[in-house]
């Protein structure tokens, strides 16, 4: 009886010969039972972009741990690199007509499909419930923070941030004197968008040519406390706000490449976003500026009020 036949009868996987692992065969077998692709420098699954490969490494370890092989951590790293080749697809364009949610996909025409049958770029960690009541606490918070005519503008901008598209060609700046509670908007959006939102700095984006690459695959970048210094350069910021499709991205120590860019910019500030040298209409025309109401005299502040905690935990599903 051949060695391979003995292994089959022992229910040993074909990628293990009893002594060593055939990494290419392992990847082929692994990918046969899982939905995963590698595109644009990242792994994607039905749950969206893989932002932390530790769970993936854990799955691989569960397959390997019964095989007596040396240096399993290095073996797993090798398998991850081979998987990038085995699961590679040339491109994975964003889908601008739908929002992928925890319990299905909502099309922009209002139709909803349950489940996660397809691999997607972004999946938001909130549920779509068409019969959910109005988010009363959220609306009350907005009524106390913004003027009535500005609330629909904020709501539309938030809706705009749910799809991977920069067609609106606008960023938003919400300014106030401080202490109004405007940064709670960022906390709520973080609950809605999950790993599709990133904390960042408008100043860093304007100065650092590598900062744009950090926004690849991201739906929204929030600057929670925008610096008041006027921007020396505005071209990087404007290029993100007006991006249509792919743009040139660069990471430190690596050759530049073409990557999809659809990150929107939202900043909270005590003043206007100014440019030191750019006096063109284009820079200021791209900004939606909202001014908060004055902080009520005698209001007692709580850095993490129970009501806002409840809002972030229970009402984020109701925005949709």
Task: Locate each region found by the language model.
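P-loop NTPase catalytic core of nucleic-acid-dependent motor ATPases
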Residues: 31-58, 95, 99-100, 105-219, ...
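Long, basic/Gly/Ser/Thr-rich N-terminal segments
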Residues: 53-105
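Substrate-gripping "pore-loop 1 plus following alpha2 helix"
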Residues: 200-205, 235-255, 303
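AAA+/SF3 P-loop NTPase mechanochemical coupling elements
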Residues: 210-216, 249-268
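Conserved AAA+/SF3 P-loop NTPase catalytic/coupling segment centered on the Walker-B
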Residues: 220-241, 277-282
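A short beta-strand-to-loop transition that corresponds to the Sensor-1 phosphate-sensing loop
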Residues: 225-226, 263, 267-272, 293-294
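A short helix-turn-beta junction within AAA+ P-loop NTPase domains corresponding to the substrate/partner-engaging
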Residues: 280-293
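Conserved small/polar residues in nucleotide/adenosyl-binding loops
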Residues: 309-316
